[in-house]
Regions:
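Sec-dependent signal peptide recognition
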Residues: 2-8
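Short Cys/His-rich metal-coordination motifs, predominantly Zn2+-binding knuckles/fingers
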Residues: 89-90, 108-111
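N-terminal pre-ligand scaffold of iron-sulfur
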Residues: 19-99, 117, 132-151
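C-terminal motif of bacterial Sec signal peptides marking the signal peptidase cleavage site
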Residues: 13-16
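Short metal-binding segments enriched for Cys and/or His
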Residues: 113-125, 136
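Winged helix-turn-helix DNA-binding recognition segment
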Residues: 102
Length: 151
């Protein structure tokens, strides 16, 4: 009986982990971006509710923004999230998704991706594939709060 409970708990923990290594239609491009929240966007805190930042061009030489740019947001789950701006259905690099409230909307196919809890899943349209998600790492020192986005 005890072995059965250990198996069930391990299975639940394994299923609860977020898998960022899924296969996406959006081409796998390098992502390495650092956002200094303290200096550049002091309002961009998870305590302030849902907010978004769209990054379409890099400032520094060694910043990589994926396929069509980055969408970084604070979701209602109290976490920072990041995804590629490329719609997995259209794959138009020059026509990235646009933020409209709690949704990212493709201007070509009108696909709506729900950003509210960080999953970027489609809710209206033709595809069943979410936006390509990237890993976010929050780093806090005594004076600065930075968010790294990587793949």
């Amino acid at each position: 009986m005890r072995l059965r409970w250990i198996y069930i708990v391990c299975a639940m923990l394994f299923c609860a982990c977020e898998n960022l290594n899924y296969r996406s239609s959006v081409p796998n491009m390098p992502v390495h971006y650092t956002l200094n929240i303290t200096r550049e966007h002091p309002h961009f805190m998870v305590e302030n509710g849902f907010q978004t930042i769209v990054v379409t061009s890099s400032i520094y030489e060694r910043e990589y923004l994926g396929y069509a740019g980055l969408l970084i947001w604070t979701a209602l789950d109290g976490q920072y999230h990041a995804a590629d701006l490329g719609c997995p259905h259209c794959l138009k690099r020059h026509m990235p998704v646009e933020v409209d409230g709690l949704y990212a909307v493709c201007p070509i196919c009108d696909e709506h991706y729900d950003l509210s809890y960080g999953y970027a899943i489609p809710t209206k349209g033709k595809t069943q594939e979410p936006l390509r998600k990237y890993q976010t790492i929050l780093q806090q020192s005594a004076t600065e709060l930075t968010l790294r986005v990587i793949n």
